[in-house]
Swiss-Prot record:
Protein name stated in the entry: Uridylate kinase
Subunit structure comment from the entry: Homohexamer.
Gene name tied to this protein: pyrH
Superkingdom of origin: Bacteria
GO biological process, any: UDP biosynthetic process
Substrates-to-products reaction catalysed: UMP + ATP = UDP + ADP
Length: 237
């Protein structure tokens, strides 16, 4: 059965990387994610990843606690770079070739973001991990995922979370919450379902770039989404 999506932008939240912990990186979770990514690479799918940093530092919370918002956001971008390096190292150990590109210049550690090079890496079947969000304060890593998805000519943005889709309310807090199989962008925005922030949703809607929200912890879920099976929640125009 052929894949439905040839090139994907995978958004990994920092919270997903810490697993059941409250801080930091769960190595077993990172290894699981790498195995899932390796599985779709074997199908010929090209993979770009945007990673968050909330497992290490939450800029908006720190700004709310009195820290300067711009400073807090830059610290959050550095946290995403740490996560990107952890993913890169896990991929190396599992035989997956990857490159890390950062929207902030840290040349001794990672490459700067250059769209042409990133596209070439994808053509060469290398995984590209994007760090530091958009490189600008006040923009979330969800918005970075939408932006990089468009720049990389991705067929879909896949948001990997701890739950298996979008629900009427938080299923971890409300056992009666119902999962949506699919939604339009306008429905997701009007219902304020917290799929992604409004900027990211609007960007994807305007560029007709679909989104799927799924659980990265379900073994094989990523592959099922790629194959077009009923997995997660699809958001489309």
């Amino acid at each position: 059965m052929p894949v439905v999506y040839k090139r994907i932008l995978l958004k990994l939240s920092g919270e997903a990387l810490m697993g059941d912990g409250h801080y930091g990186i769960d190595r077993a979770v990172v290894e699981h994610i790498v195995v899932e990514v390796a599985g779709v690479l074997q199908l010929g799918v090209e993979v770009a990843i945007v990673v968050g940093g909330g497992n290490i530092f939450r800029g908006m919370k720190s700004a709310g606690d009195g820290m300067d918002r711009v400073t807090a956001d830059y610290m959050g971008m550095l946290a995403t770079t740490m996560n990107a390096l952890a993913l890169h190292d896990a991929m190396r150990r599992n035989g997956v070739v990857s490159r890390v590109q950062s929207a902030l210049r840290i040349d001794q550690v990672v490459e700067p973001y250059v769209r042409g090079k990133a596209l070439r890496y994808l053509d060469e079947r290398k995984v590209v991990v994007f760090a530091a969000g958009t490189g600008n304060p006040f923009f979330t890593t969800d918005t970075a995922a939408a932006l990089r998805g468009m720049e990389m000519n991705a067929n879909i943005v896949l948001k990997a979370t701890k739950v298996d889709g979008i629900y009427t309310s938080d299923p971890l807090k409300n056992k009666d919450a119902q999962r949506f199989q699919s939604l339009t962008f306008d429905e997701a925005i009007s219902k304020n379902l917290q799929v992604m922030d409004a900027t990211a949703l609007t960007l994807c809607r305007d560029q007709k770039l679909p989104i799927n929200v799924f659980s990265i912890f379900k073994t094989g879920a990523l592959k099922r989404v790629i194959m077009g099976e009923d997995e997660g929640t699809s958001v489309f125009v």
